[in-house]
């Protein structure tokens, strides 16, 4: 069997897995499977080096990815009627199974899913509000999107005599709807009292495990300045972000922060606050009254 046939077989198996989860009512697993397959198809469509598929076939794969995203969005939107039903999605099985020979018109009037856009800090909150306002009227246009890289964590700085470095292990975050979050990651930044960056901003990779009300990261973040060199009033911020397929952008769901007097070796849990992220720490509103927090572990390195 050729590589391209193996790829198609793998896609078909993934599609079957997703629709099976969907029909069994295992919606979180179905959403995850649909999202994984949509990413794989998008990657193939966007690859300029791939010659396994014709341009027409790539266009069909792009439309297929759109339908997967639409079904994912429908499963997450419990307030309204499903926009894209499971029986509609199942009609597409012959396409993914026989993409190399499929030559009929695509059964639904959809466009290939656009590339994702990564928004500048604060921009996602503005767009979030605009999208919410537009949702009722159908107004607004879809932005273009570019793929997000899998994390941007930096290595530990070289040690200096008498200076202290901090490693923060992000263990997990507690959220009541943890299982519904798509491609969750955390942006870590260090700000002064005026909200100005003191260090390079770092993104964790996307979390790999969800369990009950927790999303597990288990990832080390190296703070990019010796603690003795941080100004008075500085704080370390953690912005929890996730992808919204219906709105097609990455949004900040909540944030947390640590002040300098909280830096000490060992575990710590910190409270979660509602967006938009308030880097100046003036107007803080707790995300929930439930005992859900960001769980960290701190390691200090001193020569």
From Swiss-Prot:
Alphabetically ordered keywords of this record: Coiled coil, Developmental protein
Keyword hit for Coiled coil: yes
InterPro entries attached to this UniProt entry: Aida_C, AIDA_N, AIDA_N_sf, C2_domain_sf
Coiled coil: 25-51
GO MF annotation: an example: phosphatidylinositol binding
C2 Aida-type domain mapped to chain residues: 154-301
GO cellular component: membrane
UniProt key word Coiled coil: yes
GO biological process: determination of ventral identity; dorsal/ventral pattern formation; negative regulation of determination of dorsal identity; negative regulation of JNK cascade; negative regulation of JUN kinase activity; negative regulation of protein-containing complex assembly
S-S bridge residues: none
Tissue: At 24 hours post-fertilization, expressed in most tissues, with strongest expression in the brain and somites.
Official protein name in the record: Axin interactor, dorsalization-associated protein
Organism the protein comes from: Danio rerio
Taxonomic lineage from the root: Eukaryota, Metazoa, Chordata, Craniata, Vertebrata
Gene that produces this protein: aida
